[in-house]
């Protein structure tokens, strides 16, 4: 349960203000079928994060060195500081609109997650916990927790929530996780 909860909270916080939240907002404005968007996000996240968690698990299992916990915890701190850098509002192309909400959400979310903070966090969580199933389940839940409200109430939320303050809180959690892990060594 710890792996699931840590993975969920970590990705939920990492996702705040991320480009995929902006993507959710843009897709929700373009498509009326919210359920298809959510299912597309879910499918893309499960595949992307399962591969990422597996990679982290594989790396920690195949590079059994006493430096691995140090590398993982320092990486959490680095991701924490990375969260302080706002993502750019990337334009969503309209060339895939004819495929429908599900396929557009699936393709764009899968691509947007490649090399993203949440994918890096998922790799790190996979390396730390060596539990592909629970990390994938937790990180997928985190993505949905962060994106479903944006799909349904994005414009109203973005006008009321000071994103810069939330970004600092999310960054602090990552840095504290890394520091806690370093102290535990």
Segment roles from a protein language model:
Residues 1-61, 121-142:
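Juxtamembrane transmembrane-helix termini in multi-pass membrane transport proteins
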Residues 2-6, 172, 184:
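Multi-pass membrane proteins that catalyze or facilitate reactions on polyprenyl-/lipid-phosphate substrates
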Residues 32-93, 97-100, 149-160, 165, ...:
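Membrane helix-loop-helix hairpins that form the core translocation module of multi-pass transporters
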Residues 179-185:
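Juxtamembrane boundary at the C-terminal end of a transmembrane helix
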């Amino acid at each position: 349960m710890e792996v699931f909860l840590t993975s969920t909270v970590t990705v939920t916080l990492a996702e705040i203000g991320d480009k995929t939240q902006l993507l959710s907002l843009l897709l929700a404005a373009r498509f009326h079928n919210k359920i298809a968007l959510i299912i597309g996000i879910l499918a893309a996240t499960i595949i992307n994060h399962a591969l990422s968690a597996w990679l982290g698990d594989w790396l920690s299992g195949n590079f059994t060195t006493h430096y691995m916990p140090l590398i993982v915890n320092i990486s959490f701190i680095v991701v924490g500081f990375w969260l302080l850098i706002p993502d750019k509002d990337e334009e969503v192309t309209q060339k895939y609109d004819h495929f429908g909400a599900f396929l557009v959400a699936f393709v764009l979310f899968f691509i947007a997650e490649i090399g993203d903070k949440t994918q890096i966090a998922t790799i790190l969580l996979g390396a730390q916990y060596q539990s592909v199933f629970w990390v994938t389940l937790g990180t997928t839940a985190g993505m949905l927790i962060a994106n479903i409200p944006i799909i349904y109430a994005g414009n109203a939320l973005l006008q009321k929530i000071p994103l810069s303050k939330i970004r600092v809180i999310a960054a602090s959690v990552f840095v504290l996780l890394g520091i806690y892990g370093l102290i535990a060594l």
